[in-house]
Amino acid sequence: MLRLCLAFCVAFVGLHMPTALAQTTSLQGSPGPTVAGWIESATFPDYGITLNAKLDTGADSSSLGVTGLDRFKRDGKTWYRFTLTGMDGKTVTIEQQTNRTARIMRAEVEDTRRPIVQLKICLAGQVAVTDFTLTDRSDRRTALLVGRRFLSSRILVDSGRTHLFPQPCEDGK
């Protein structure tokens, strides 16, 4: 009797294991993180700018490629002015107050400090205000690198696919 019960339990678990695994790996439409490709379109809805983004699980923070980065003081506080250029060529100049910087350590060059700003981003249907370091990414494939701080608990990256979300957000917000 015990063997029969054990055999039934093993068979039952075996039949239902794929369902349980599918739920924990969170396929599109199920609760939990969204699956996205390693390159996706991302929108900054407050500015109407869309960029290609590299989703990089090896990077801790997110980095935004800008031009004309300028530090200045306004009312005794540190501000940054920078220009963001979308895939369609549209440009917008943004001014944001911040006192925060990130120390960037790379093996081939000396450590640098980059300003950190907070911007609202929409990526793979996920909208959030997140931190971005500002830098020149003109020598990179994408102007935007999205790191683990944004991806964690929101997006799982399929490293074999790209552009699973042609529209970053359904309603652009």
Each model region followed by its residue ranges:
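N-terminal secretory signal peptides that target proteins for export/translocation
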Residues: 1-2
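Bacterial N-terminal signal peptides
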Residues: 5-16
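Pepsin/retropepsin-fold aspartyl endopeptidases
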Residues: 21-173
